[in-house]
Amino acid sequence: MAQLLRRHLPVILSLILFLSKATADANFTVSRAAYYPNSDIKGTENGACEYGAFGATLNNGDVSASASLYRDGVGCGACYQVRCTNPYYCSPNGVTIVITDSGASDGTDFILSQHAFTRMAQSTDAGTALLTLGVVGIEYRRVSCTYPNKNIVFKITESSNFPNYLEFEIWYQQGNQDIIAVQLCETVNLTCQLLSRTHGAVWAAVSPPSGPLSIRMLFSSGAPRGGDTWLVPTNIVPQNWTAGATYDSGVQVQLQ
């Protein structure tokens, strides 16, 4: 019996490793990825999420466009682990990217920044080889975004016009949940209005309430029976808010 076990031990170990890898990869989706051909290797400032220059440098430039994961702007700011599958060039962990744009190319789910594309590689030389390939096979899964020592920030866009039109984006959202609704509340009279996502990551209010404002966010639990959670900032947006300004919410999504 012992001799038989020793004879088949390599096969048994190989089977265990195969099953372990299959289990580990169960949460990954198989796809393809390309990259932005821009010269500065970071993301684009003209992404569909409307992040502007912030979107090019967010997450140290490890960003991506994705038509399938953009989801009419709901997917803006979501994080994904993306790893290429060529064993000669690719690292096992790949890279964590943030969705900042919508786009697809040559049957891909991701158009990565060059910075992110090369970070999937084992080495600098391997990264150069990946760029030469242009399009590579990948696996990906959604993961939690992490922004240590940062609160959620509200960026008032330059398209805003005080006091008649308020338009803003939500930056530095941790976790892996979607913001599915936003309320704009006047903090003195406690009157609130439900806002619409106008495009990309942009929320807007025509004739917003006067006075100090609280921007409250509803996070999806992902559960079929609800369990969605409101996050209420501890800081307010001042009564005399300004187009182009950023305001710290004082709160952050707590990672599990």
Curated annotation (Swiss-Prot):
Q: Which one GO biological process term can you cite for this protein? A: plant-type cell wall loosening
- Compartment(s): Secreted
Gene Ontology cellular-component terms listed = extracellular region
PROSITE patterns recorded for this chain?
EXPANSIN_CBD, EXPANSIN_EG45
- Which residues are in coiled coils? none
Please provide the record's keywords in A-Z order: Glycoprotein, Secreted, Signal
Secreted: present as a keyword of the record?
yes
Which of this chain's residues carry glycans? Answer: 27, 189, 240
- Extract the InterPro entries matched here: Expan_Lol_pI, Expansin/allergen_DPBB_dom, Expansin_CBD, Expansin_CBD_sf, RlpA-like_DPBB, RlpA-like_sf
Q: Which residues form the Expansin-like CBD domain?
A: 164-249
The signal peptide here is 1-24
Q: Where is the Expansin-like EG45 domain?
A: 46-150
Q: What is its main location?
A: secreted
Pfam families in alphabetical order:
DPBB_1, Expansin_C
Query: So which domain of life are we looking at?
Result: Eukaryota
Q: Extract the PANTHER family matched here.
A: EXPANSIN-B3, EXPANSIN-LIKE B1
Family to which the UniProt record says this protein belongs: Belongs to the expansin family. Expansin-like B subfamily.
Tell me what this protein is called: Expansin-like B1
